[in-house]
């Protein structure tokens, strides 16, 4: 839904669209022009210079968590299933859980599977793929290290990826958070993003960076 309305336009008028702000000033500005009562999410939008064959995707744990704990579903059997339960997975199973999802169960946020389960889990591709939840080695969600994976997910491990237009949208905090903590989350995200520069890319990797709140206008960042 397009952002509009009197309060939005008032907030927009306080943003100099001809200026690129340093990240600290941008965060302060977003807090200053906030006009809604709920606790908005602070988002970063990065436009990358990528070729069609380039993939930019990574997982990370931000230093300061702000999202609710994810409901973890694990496909595993035997001892691995017991391990998943022991370390706090919300749902654990094999064929029974596969059938439950086929029947419409969707009360989970992330899916992990042991490698031996993937032949059967693959049948859920049309369902899990649509939600971006299909286990994948690139996101470390196909693994036998259930203890480590569940622990990192509970700490808030999350993923960023560039879409087909070379844009990454990533959340780094809430408007109620201390500005320093938002900045540190932003720095961690940018650090990990820059590590994913394609090795064969010539020229600029990051074209532009903007930050915004859920309902507020975007602010361009002076990114060098």
From Swiss-Prot:
Transmembrane segments: none annotated. One of its GO terms (cellular component) is large ribosomal subunit. SUPFAM superfamilies: Ribosomal protein L1. GO terms for molecular function: rRNA binding; structural constituent of ribosome; tRNA binding. Keywords: Repressor, Ribonucleoprotein, Ribosomal protein, RNA-binding, rRNA-binding, Translation regulation, tRNA-binding. GO terms for biological process: regulation of translation; translation. CDD domains: Ribosomal_L1. Part of the 50S ribosomal subunit. PANTHER family: 54S RIBOSOMAL PROTEIN L1, MITOCHONDRIAL, LARGE RIBOSOMAL SUBUNIT PROTEIN UL1M. Belongs to the universal ribosomal protein uL1 family. Binds directly to 23S rRNA. The L1 stalk is quite mobile in the ribosome, and is involved in E site tRNA release. HAMAP family: Ribosomal_uL1_B. This is Large ribosomal subunit protein uL1. It comes from Borrelia duttonii (strain Ly). The gene is rplA.
